[in-house]
Amino acid sequence: MSSAFLLLACALVISVHADGVCRNRRQCNKEVCGSSYDVAIVGAGPGGANSAYMLRESGLDIAVFEYSDRVGGRLFTYQLPNTPDVNLEIGGMRFIEGAMHRLWKVISELGLTPKVFKEGFGKEGRQRFYLRGQSLTKKQVKSGDVPYDLSPEEKANQGRLVEYYLEKLTGLQLNGGPLKREVALKLTVPDGRFLYDLTFDEALDLVASPEGKEFARDTHVFTSEVTLDASAISIFDDHLGEDYYGSEIYTLEEGMSSVPQGLLQTFLDAAKSNEFFPNNHLKALRRRTNGQYVLYFEPTTSKDGQTTINYLEPLKVVCAQRVILAMPVYALRQLDWSQLRNDRATQAYRAVRPMPASKVFMTFDQPWWLQNERKSWVTKSDALFSQMYDWQKSEASGDYILIASYADGLKAQYLRELKNQGEDIPGSDPGYNQVTVPLKDAILEHLTEAYGVERDSIPEPVTAASQFWTDYPFGCGWITWRAGYHFDDVISTMRRPSLKDEVYVVGSDYSWGLISSWIEGALETSENVINDYFL
C-alpha cells in the first residue's frame, strides 16, 4: 500500500514539473531569472505600444514581449504583390476626426499623415444596400419603400429609427446631441429595468414591430450589437453615442500599423534600457514571496502570417517588478495565472463577448462593380459578404482593389470554414492570409447577386488576401458588451484583476462601448492604467 502511494507521489511530482513552470511559492522563489526588469509589457499592439511609449523616459528597465514577429496587433497594414503602392488595411482601417482625441494626439506626436478615408461609412450616392434580395440606395433605406412591413409610426421615423426606439423605450430626447455614457447607463425602460440589462431583442420587442426590429438589425449590418446576449445599450451607443460624434473619416498615409510601430520605435529610441523581444508567447505568470513576478515565455516561429509555438524548446524565464498584460481578452482568459480564476476577475471578464471578424481583399483588372446600373462604391447587405468597399486603383499595375467581404459574427466564422477548404486560388497570398476557391466562389456568388450581374460575366481575381480575426491570440476583431453588466462596476477589475498584485491589463477589449472596436479604446485603457498606477 505504502509503495503504491510512493509511486503515485513520484508520478505527481514529475507531472507538475514537466511543463517547466513552478507550481508553488517555494519553487517560484528558487526560480533562476534569465533576465529581470522593472516592467514587463506583454503585447505589441496599440495598447502595449502606447504603454511603453508613455513610460519611455521613466528611467525604468522596461521590456516589451510580443507573441508574433509583427508589431501592430489588430492594426495590420498589408500589400499585395501587384499593388505595392497601395496600403491594404486588413485590420482597423479608419478613425473619426473630432471623436478620437487620443489617436489624433498620438498621430501628431509621431508626425504621421492623416488622409481622408474616401468612402467614410458609406456616402449618399455612392452606397447601396442589398436586403432581402432587393438593391436599395441609401436614400431609399432612409425614406423610401423597403422590403419590410413597417408600422405607420416606424415608417414616419424610418430615417431615425434607432433614435425613435430609444425615445419610446426611455423617454429620452437627444435633440441632436450625443448619448453620453453616464446618461446611457442610467436609462430605464417602462417596467423599471435598466436598459443595459436588456438584450437587443428584449428591448426592441417592447417598442418595435417584428418587421421594424428586423429592419433595424439588418441595416445595422454588423451583428455584434444585435444578436445573442449583446446589451441593448450597444446599438444605441453605436448609432448615437458621443464617441461616434465627429466630422470627417480619416486613415493614415503611412498605414494604420504605423501608429503602434511608431510608438514602439520611439520607446526603443528613448533609452538603451528599453527593449523589445518578438516571438515570445507568455505561457504562465507567477509571484514570488518578495513580490517579484516570474513570467514563463515559450519561443514561437512566424512564417507566412502564421505564428506557432515551439513546444520542444525550453521556456524563457523573465522576472519583473510589475507587469502590463496588453493582451486580447481571448488570450488573457487562457493565461496560466491563478488570479484570473478568482470570482471577481471571472465575473468581470464574462461581461464581454469576443466577436469574430474577417476581411477578404481581391484585385481585378477592371472595376466590374462600377459598370452596371447598381454601381456603388460601398454595399452593405444581409448576405454572406456583409459589406463591400471599393478600395482604390493601383497606379503601379492598373488593377482595381476591392474589399470583397467585411464580416463579423457567424458570417465570419462560416467564411473561415470555407477558407480552410479546397485549393488556393491563383494569385492568393500564401499561408494564413490565403484565399481558397470555396471562399472566393461563395463571396463572389453573393456579391454578383447583389449587383445584379451574372457570376460568369465578371473577371477572376488577379490577387487576393484574407484576414480572419478568429484565432489565437486575438480570437476576435472586437468585443461586445453582454446584457446585465454595468461598465463602471467591472472595468476597474478588468484593468487590475487582483488588488494585491501589480499586474495590469490594457487593450481595446477593456474599454467602453463604441471605442472598444477602435484603436482609441486601446489608447484610452493604456493611458488610464499608466496614469493611475505608474506616473
From Swiss-Prot:
EC number: 1.4.3.2
Pfam family, one: Amino_oxidase
Catalytic activity: an L-alpha-amino acid + O2 + H2O = a 2-oxocarboxylate + H2O2 + NH4(+)
Entry keyword Flavoprotein: yes
Mod. after translation: Not glycosylated.
Main subcellular location: secreted
Expression (tissue specificity): Expressed exclusively in the ink gland. Within the ink gland, it is only detected in amber vesicles (at protein level).
Subcellular location: Secreted
Entry's Gene Ontology cellular component terms: extracellular region
GO molecular function: L-amino-acid oxidase activity
Record keywords, A-Z: Antibiotic, Antimicrobial, FAD, Flavoprotein, Fungicide, Oxidoreductase, Secreted, Signal
Binding residue positions for FAD: 46-47, 66-67, 74, 91-94, 513-518
Cofactor dependence: FAD
Signal sequence, renumbered to the chain: 1-18
One biological process term in Gene Ontology: defense response to fungus
Residues noted as binding substrate in the record, renumbered to the chain: 94, 406, 513-514
Family: Belongs to the flavin monoamine oxidase family.
PANTHER family listed in its UniProt record: AMINE OXIDASE (PTHR10742:SF342), FLAVIN MONOAMINE OXIDASE (PTHR10742)
Role according to the record: Catalyzes the oxidative deamination of positively charged L-amino acids L-Lys and L-Arg and, much less efficiently, of amino acids L-His and L-Tyr. Has antimicrobial activity. Inhibits growth of Gram-negative bacteria E.coli strain MC4100 (MIC=0.62 ug/ml), E.coli strain C921-b2, S.typhimurium strain AA 140 (MIC=0.62 ug/ml), P.aeruginosa strain PAO1 (MIC=0.31 ug/ml) and V.harveyi strain BB170 (MIC=0.25 ug/ml).
Name used for this protein in its record: L-amino-acid oxidase
